[in-house]
């Protein structure tokens, strides 16, 4: 599992498996002992912070959007990438007893073809719908959420049809306004009604 789904990609976490400690399990267990829910936070398009090239991006250039980041960012318009991401997240959520999953769409954008994000919005909706379905098939209740831009205009610009997600109960929660200190709180309240 660790080869397929590396959970210890940051240097600080690499020391724990060598000492026989499963840090993810430990953190989740300690949260639950204290009555705190534990959520997995998954960046949809992580950037590589080492000098090593991302082999997956090198081997699947059709999964990548050429952008400001040297190796590009993940392209959710690719069905194959969607399946890879769904399998990746589902494996994590199956292995660990997280209470929920939050897909971070703000680290890093874009995740759809530049200038055509709204045109490709169904790709992200399809991804989130499948994720919700996968989570509902686990043997426990798992909340599904998304970290989103500061307002409706920014969501639409990035290709997130959050009104549809809310209407169809695709997400259980949103983390809003991550690119500003002045998010449109009223819009997020209306969205939740």
Q: Which role does the model predict for each range below?
A:
Residues 1-19, 110, 114, 187-188:
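Aromatic-lined carbohydrate-binding/catalytic grooves of carbohydrate-active enzymes
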Residues 1-10, 47-59, 185-186:
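Short secondary-structure boundary segments
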Residues 80-193:
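Active-site neighborhood of glycoside hydrolase catalytic domains
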Residues 2-5, 63-67, 139, 163-166:
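Short amphipathic alpha-helical segments, especially helix-boundary/capping motifs
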Residues 1, 42-48, 104-109:
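Short, solvent-exposed turn/loop segments enriched in Gly/Ser/Thr/Pro and often Arg
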Residues 14-29, 33, 38-95:
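Active-site-adjacent "subsite" loops/lids of carbohydrate-active enzymes
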Residues 5, 9, 70, 143-144:
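A generic structural signal for ordered alpha-helices
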Residues 11-13, 73-75, 117, 146-148:
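A short, structure-level motif marking secondary-structure boundaries and short turns
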């Amino acid at each position: 599992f660790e080869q397929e789904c590396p959970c210890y990609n940051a240097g600080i976490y690499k020391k724990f498996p060598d000492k026989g400690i499963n840090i993810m399990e430990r953190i989740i267990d300690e949260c639950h002992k204290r009555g705190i829910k534990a959520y997995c936070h998954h960046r949809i398009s992580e950037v590589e912070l080492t000098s090593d090239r991302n082999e997956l991006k090198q081997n699947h250039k059709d999964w990548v959007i050429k952008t400001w980041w040297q190796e590009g960012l993940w392209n959710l318009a690719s069905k194959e990438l969607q399946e890879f991401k769904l399998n990746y997240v589902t494996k994590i959520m199956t292995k660990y007893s997280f209470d929920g999953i939050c897909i971070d769409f703000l680290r890093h954008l874009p995740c759809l073809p530049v200038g055509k994000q709204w045109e490709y919005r169904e790709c992200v909706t399809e991804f989130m719908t499948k994720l919700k379905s996968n989570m509902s098939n686990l043997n426990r209740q798992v909340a599904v959420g998304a970290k989103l831009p500061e307002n409706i205009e920014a969501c639409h610009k990035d290709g997130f049809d959050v009104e549809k997600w809310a209407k169809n109960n695709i997400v259980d929660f949103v983390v809003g306004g991550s690119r500003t200190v002045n998010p449109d709180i009223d819009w997020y309240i209306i969205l939740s009604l």
